[in-house]
């Protein structure tokens, strides 16, 4: 065996950008990363588009990034896969989707479309919603209601109005559908058990309770007038003659077209789980035909999944377990699922010999209020694990560049970058002390571009910029090759450990003899 432990450090949302304007990575004081990039083998890696199984030019994201890293191969994402099925026409024969249609026909009930209405491509894509309108039209379903969840994180903060406008035009063109509610993802797509937020969304959907507006566009505009951007639009019910256009009722069908699970779970559980305890449901549990685009959570009952995931076998974690090696995964709450569930190919169960260390994320409204988040605690746990000599491999994620980058607050993002730099320094020292080795990377860009260079507006989304690949304390005879992507990381780590990569991994090691 080689040096031990081998650490994979993921700096979430830490991209590289030649421009310094609006670039927290360039503006922060980062003596540690500067030194590593100057003195260690360092190249720029690809973390977006086809390199991670997304459509060309599509920004990467944390789920996709960790999936590719853990798989050691390019994993074609749901976005790419579903879009292809729409183009091929297979989409319109999908059994689960037709189950929703048949239920509406049988019970003369309504079809509700839930989902993040944007082209961000991280959680959903608006073209998938358009395909659902087309599906309803082809099957003669007339009562189709869109519940528009606004984005503003993976898209510009005030772009929601245009997405609603485009959706309304598409409904007009296809000849079916109307907007029934509008709400920000802050409420309906929480992932941190903030049930008070989810309850507001649920009550708008089921009771027609909340803010009211005469039309979808009016709902967005009245929020903008109160300085609420897309993400924070209060759940708003569209009313006609003083009554809600539509609410979700017993025997209706719901199709939730988000394909990424983490932020779809809570609201889905509120509808589908007969033993739900998050908050008091005004009407209690009632039966629906609820179709989830993907498997949000196997523990949520009473739903049907439309697109089952392609199994990924022999992930990096599985490979380590099969070789009897001990591994640790650690991160704070916001990214814990990424270093565990997503890194393991979408499998919840830990591998044999896989320990997990979760550090709670701070309970603040938005992370610009505490840009260091829980980085120092994650760092302390990591340093202790390195010194313990207990693990062969440790995988860690620092959430700050991404989570604080999403706020668009440049000053806070700079502080986040500086906090992470300090942590990287402590870990490098611990690695050298233990004679371990480390590979530093990022899963996608974010903090390196916080303004839209054309409009000069805040830019809160991920980017298509390259990310750093840095080799720390490995054999000096080696450097890194250019042109790699996230799928090449696991094969690199396996070679660093003196082992042979499994045939299922099609990525290629980045190590190159000088």
Which role does the model predict for each range below?
Residues 1-514:
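Feature captures the catalytic ectodomains and active-site-proximal regions of enzymes
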